Amino acid sequence: MAAPILFWHRRDLRLSDNIGLAAARAQSAQLIGLFCLDPQILQSADMAPARVAYLQGCLQELQQRYQQAGSRLLLLQGDPQHLIPQLAQQLQAEAVYWNQDIEPYGRDRDGQVAAALKTAGIRAVQLWDQLLHSPDQILSGSGNPYSVYGPFWKNWQAQPKPTPVATPTELVDLSPEQLTAIAPLLLSELPTLKQLGFDWDGGFPVEPGETAAIARLQEFCDRAIADYDPQRNFPAEAGTSGLSPALKFGAIGIRQAWRAASAAHALSRSDEARNSIRVWQQELAWREFYQHALYHFPSLADGPYRSLWQQFPWENREALFTAWTQAQTGYPIVDAAMRQLTETGWMHNRCWMIVASFLTKDLIIDWRRGEQFFMQHLVDGDLAANNGGWQWSASSGMDPKPLRIFNPASQAKKFDATATYIKRWLPELRHVHPKDLISGEITPIGRRGYPAPIVNHNLRQKQFKALYNQLKAAIAEPEAEPDS
């Protein structure tokens, strides 16, 4: 029997449109999947129960998909730097394929695994899959990575987009002798969520697995994508795709998503619909902008992109941070969003911007505390997107506007005018008139235990601006012009 090829799954929990997997299948029919439950990730302080639950659901379906194709998914638990080379050696594998990671830990881990495989005389083949364009494809004319989205988008959107690759079929499983040889290294079955040390019953924006992700993409592109632009900022409406967890874990291929949107664009009969589809495609470009940024500037994972913000005098008042995490700020739109996050593991993007601005510029708390809290709860928690979003809100990252400050009441009035979203997540305030919910000016009797505002927005934004201007003057570092 020919030497098998192993494919190591990480953020690509599917068989369809998987570049590394398709390349491995082109080399051999005896293609065996593997996934390693890495304690470095699962036991991280940033791990969210919702994310582990989604991962487990994806792995369950991936096991079934491999069986249907004639092969299997091997499960390991422990340090992949040791287990994967050991498994490959036991099987006398010809090669181990995987798709590249952009995160600092993943890149270091992959380098260690590749080095160990090379020492053992086994090929390590790494390909790009989670991006439409790899980080070295989208560079400025001088060969540097972009730090501003506009020029990045202009270059990115002009590049021809790759098409989905074929789904591997007619695979060959390991022999009984091979399975016996590696049995001591393997998990006999996928651990339950409880066995992994987590509990989750908050559901998901889209059910785990490739089948549900493909169905949701098709449903979205058949209908809602045509109204995406006018609907996407209203949290009470189902105006977004809900595909962020599937894209995070690779339950769906990015090329599949682009092709489906492009097909909808070609079939659209109005300029408004075509514009909406283009806006959704721009969100895919934002995703790649942040991933490219983290790849080129891995220090973003630990701190601000702009050095001025290293010295910003965050107040970091613990009582205010606790109130924010517990949806007790007294600002209904903020508290509704925070409750949605903690109960469902997901938050509407408009609300994300509101609560992030509130934490950093009303409460004057270091954005990194908000970033970590989100990662501890988000089902779609992605280091690059989460970090990029928080640095955007704090004005410490790329494309900064330091004095961009969201007024919670103005945001609620514009995007939740009937307070439908607020009442959905704060049912204890359903008796309050929408006008008062939006403004936050609720009478003491009407509050019925709901807190009064913990800070005065107008006063705090003045204090934040003063702190920023004082620091800027002291350091005299060029920054982007603030909003007028």
UniProtKB/Swiss-Prot annotation:
Coiled coil: none
InterPro entries: Crypto/Photolyase_FAD-like_sf (IPR036134), Crypto/Photolyase_N_sf (IPR036155), Cryptochr/Photolyase_FAD-bd (IPR005101), Cryptochrome/DNA_photolyase_1 (IPR002081), DNA_photolyase_1_CS_C (IPR018394), DNA_photolyase_N (IPR006050), Photolyase_8HDF (IPR019947), Rossmann-like_a/b/a_fold (IPR014729)
Binding site for coenzyme F420-(gamma-Glu)n: 36-38, 51, 101-109, 248
Keyword terms, alphabetized: Chromophore, DNA damage, DNA repair, DNA-binding, FAD, Flavoprotein, Lyase, Nucleotide-binding
Region (DNA-binding): 141-148
Domain of life: Bacteria
Cofactor comment text: Binds 1 FAD per subunit. Binds 1 coenzyme F420 non-covalently per subunit.
Site (Electron transfer via tryptophanyl radical): 314, 367, 390
EC number: 4.1.99.3
Enzyme class label: lyase
Positions of the Photolyase/cryptochrome alpha/beta domain: 3-132
Cofactor: FAD; coenzyme F420-(gamma-Glu)n
Region (Interaction with DNA): 283-290, 349-350
Any GO MF annotation of the entry: FAD binding
Similarity annotation: Belongs to the DNA photolyase class-1 family.
Subunit-level organization: Monomer.
PANTHER family cross-referenced by the UniProt entry: CRYPTOCHROME, CRYPTOCHROME CIRCADIAN CLOCK 5 ISOFORM X1
Protein name: Deoxyribodipyrimidine photo-lyase
Organism: Synechococcus sp. (strain ATCC 27144 / PCC 6301 / SAUG 1402/1) (Anacystis nidulans)
Upper lineage: Bacteria, Bacillati, Cyanobacteriota, Cyanophyceae, Synechococcales
